Amino acid sequence: MGLGAPWNVVVLNDDHNTFQGVAFALSSTLPGVSYEQGMSLANRIHNTGRAIVWSGHKEAAELYWDQLRGHGLTMAPLERV
């Protein structure tokens, strides 16, 4: 792994967030993610228990992780790829 290795932002399934709430949080936080894409990710999170919702530089990953947690999403620790 190089120093610039990407970091994954992972959202976990839970029993308190709605599909719509997850889709809104993802689409309002992550660049380039539409509400429809957020709904698709929400389905993946629900069906598999987790989903990588963004991957990239550590500083941005930390920011998006904090913002998504602020929306009330259940977050896994950042994962270094």
Language model features with spans:
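Terminal domain-initiation and capping elements
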Residues: M1-V81
